[in-house]
Regions:
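Bacterial N-terminal signal peptides that target proteins for export
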Residues: 1-11
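C-terminal beta-rich recognition modules with glycine/proline-rich loops and embedded aromatic residues
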Residues: 346, 412-420, 425-523, 543-569, ...
Length: 724
């Protein structure tokens, strides 16, 4: 019922929702925008149709290693990731579209279009047209762009004529809001007299602090590239290019230009992508300018990583999402320009993150204040921010680090973030979200956005839901990498993939129940390349390495074994020489590669410099971090629980978790863990007692589906320490 209701809302035409005057204005402004770009509506239509059969050739992105595109990887249904992709396709993206309708996102474009057709209209002096009165944030436009991006990824794997037509109707409204010179920023265009308070009096005047004009550009370009690749239509791509060209004319180092850089980074990545799609180097040059000029303009602010030039930066600091996007952008530009100084810079910063500022769940950003990184080893648990968007940015960064260096340690970090720090941000049904992701909760502290203690279907600042809308559908693209004749098996999931190796196809069929067990089977269904090799990542957690630093280590005596065989013959190799990969050489059609990883329950301790984790242990199994939630433990005070110094664990298959937070959503199953513990309990009269407790733990991503209650990841091991 919920799915049908959401879809019915999504399939409404955006134009149908507009008042008659705005609808007419949008249609007229669309024609005007096309005319100003010297492209008639008819010609644009012909061009769009032609491009469907003759697409622009995408340039090499410059990386030594290549990502296998998500369109080449078909995730099996009814698997761990199959369920997540289905939820994104059937719930998350449609929900985001419906929220764009109900939360004034489309209306902003319609109002901007009306003003363009009626400059100086009487409404501009009324409170109804005072932008700050109805637009929550100056970047609200990006919710539309990000959702279109995610929907475009879905269209490439699950063609849907109705969704395609719906997006087309939305783009009519978006294009109608574009000014004649290409500028597209509804926070100003709606009412130049009274723009959004963050916009500044003139273009670019607050772009380094609050306006987000270039942040909007970045998400627009990313979405437009995705839409073009999905549909062959240039409709959105031409809109985005016109805005990018406007920026290039007005922002840069030349006389008469505004010498500014983005206050919120992402345009760097997006413009590099636009360059590889179009071959127009001006977009790469602008991306490099944004990076090179950072720290040299009038604004010097660590919050936005603009306190010093990027080549002098060595520590992750400031707003964690902006930072992650910038570091990923540095990698993209470094790959395209062969800039070794850029690579040295992100190597330094990456090392700082994973050795001093990285949560066990793969999240980053310790502080609510500024949504920012803290100082070295500042990793509080209950007040951890760990924004979902920051986790997604870390996935982007670690994938790019792999593409630069071919080292499995980056995929180890990517996997940790993905299975814990990213998907914790979205409920299993795909319809509710966390903004921050703490590692403990008392059930009362309102850590989530908008002052809540549970996942919510949307936020006033909705960057995380719309970001998940675009990220999750692209997830299959992170499974494999390629270089020459080597295929890198980076992540493990049931899938069938068609991989281009030296211009010929290799087809792999993988079956596994990972992350619930460590058994993986890969069948080579086709190999058109003689001498192709499969390089299997042996995860860090198998090799007794929590993270590639001394920030965390395993504290138990377990020594997980692993094995790889081809057609029953064991394969051996030097993991160190192959950067954590085990080569399976000369694969051919019909080969069966079997991989086994022992998956014992492990205990983890943190570096003693992490104050909040001293004297405590965390519990992991495979790539999953576990937590205890009061609802699974008879309401026991989980925050005052103590596990044994050498705990024994049992694994419970098929442990059912109800999803009471989402109406009509089904229960789901996980592998739970149990161990003996003691709980320091305080009665109503103040008397304190110690009780034995069979402690049940569930995967961290699965918590908070049954209402607000206590949750904890790090557990004391000494009752006396807790009593103090």
């Amino acid at each position: 019922m919920m799915k049908r209701r959401i879809f019915s809302a999504v399939l409404l035409s955006a134009a149908m929702l507009a008042p008659a005057a705005l609808q007419a204005s949008a249609m007229a402004a669309t024609a005007s925008s096309a005319k100003s770009a010297n492209v008639s509506t008819k010609a644009s239509s012909v061009k769009s149709k032609a491009s469907a059969s003759q697409k622009t050739k995408v340039l090499d992105n410059g990386y030594p290693f290549a990502q296998v595109p998500f369109t080449s990887v078909k995730i099996a249904q009814n698997t761990f990731w199959g369920a997540r992709l289905k939820a994104a396709r059937e719930v998350t993206v449609p929900l985001a579209f419906s929220k764009c309708e109900s939360e004034h996102r489309y209306k902003n474009f319609e109002m901007a279009a009306y003003t363009l057709q009626h400059p100086g209209h009487a409404g501009l002096d009324t409170k109804e047209w005072d932008v700050s009165k109805f637009m929550g944030f100056s970047f609200d436009d990006t919710d539309v762009y990000k959702t279109i991006e995610g929907a475009s990824y879905i269209l490439q794997t699950y063609p849907d004529k109705k969704m395609k037509a719906y997006i087309d109707s939305v783009l009519n409204v978006v294009g109608a809001a574009q000014e004649p010179d290409g500028y597209l920023y509804t926070a100003r265009t709606i009412n130049p007299k009274h723009p959004h308070g963050w916009s500044g009096a003139t273009r670019w005047s607050k772009v380094e602090v609050l306006s987000h004009e270039l942040y909007n550009l970045g998400h627009m370009v990313d979405a437009a590239c995705a839409h073009y690749q999905a549909t062959g239509s240039r409709k959105f791509l031409d809109i985005a290019k016109r805005y990018a060209d406007c920026v290039i004319r007005e922002v840069g180092p030349k006389a008469g230009q505004h010498r500014v850089v983005p206050g919120h980074q992402i345009a760097e990545m997006a413009l590099a992508r636009l360059y590889t799609l179009t071959g127009e180097k001006k977009y790469l040059n602008e991306a490099k300018y944004f990076l090179d000029a950072r720290g040299t303009t009038s604004i010097h602010d660590a919050y936005s990583q603009s306190d010093k030039p990027i080549l002098k930066q060595s520590e992750a600091w400031g707003h964690a999402v902006r930072a992650g996007y910038m570091y990923a952008g540095i990698a993209d530009v470094a790959a395209l320009t062969r800039d070794s100084d850029y690579i040295k810079t992100i190597d330094r910063i990456w090392n700082n993150i994973v050795s001093k500022k990285y949560y066990l769940t793969g999240g980053v950003g310790a502080r609510h204040a500024g949504e920012a990184f803290g100082v070295d080893y500042e990793l509080p648990n209950m007040t951890a921010y760990n924004e979902t968007c920051a986790a997604i940015a870390q996935v982007y960064l670690n994938e790019r680090m792999f593409l630069l260096h071919g080292d499995s340690k980056y995929i180890d970090c990517l996997e940790r973030t993905l299975y814990n720090g990213v998907i914790s941000g979205m409920s299993m049904d795909g319809g509710r979200f966390f903004y921050p992701n703490p590692l403990s909760s008392d059930g009362k502290y309102k850590f989530n956005a908008d002052g809540t203690t549970t996942r919510q279907p949307w936020f006033g600042c909705a960057c995380c839901p719309s970001n998940l809308s675009r990220f999750i559908p692209s997830l299959p693209g992170y499974l494999y990498g390629v270089k020459d004749k080597d295929i890198y098996v980076n992540l493990f999931a049931g899938n069938t993939s068609t991989i281009q190796v030296m211009g010929k196809e290799v087809v792999l069929e993988e079956t596994t129940e990972y992350p619930w067990n460590g058994d993986i089977k890969i069948l080579v269904k086709k190999s058109g390349v003689k001498g192709a090799n499969l390089l299997v990542r042996i995860p860090g957690w198998v090799r007794n390495q929590v993270v590639p630093s001394d920030l965390y280590k395993y504290s138990d005596a377990e020594q997980p074994a692993y094995s790889v065989s081809v057609n029953g013959k064991v394969v051996e190799g030097d993991l160190a020489a192959n950067k954590g990969y085990l080569p399976v050489k000369n694969i051919k059609k019909g080969d069966v590669i079997r991989i086994h990883f022992d998956m014992p329950v492990r205990t983890v301790v943190a570096n003693g410099k992490v104050a909040d984790d001293r004297g405590k242990v965390a519990v992991e199994r495979g790539p999953l971090v576990y937590c205890a939630e009061a609802v699974d433990n008879d309401g026991a005070p989980i925050l005052r629980s103590v596990v044994a110094k050498n705990p024994a664990f049992s694994v419970i298959d098929g442990y059912s978790i109800s999803n009471t937070e989402s109406q009509g959503a089904p229960a789901f199953s996980v592998k739970a863990i149990q161990t003996d513990a003691q709980v320091l309990d305080q009665a109503a009269d103040g008397m304190v007692s110690v009780k034995n407790q069979k402690l049940t733990l569930i995967p961290y991503y699965a918590w908070n589906h049954r209402g607000a209650n206590q949750m904890n990841v790090w557990f004391y091991q000494d009752l006396q320490v807790l009593e103090k």
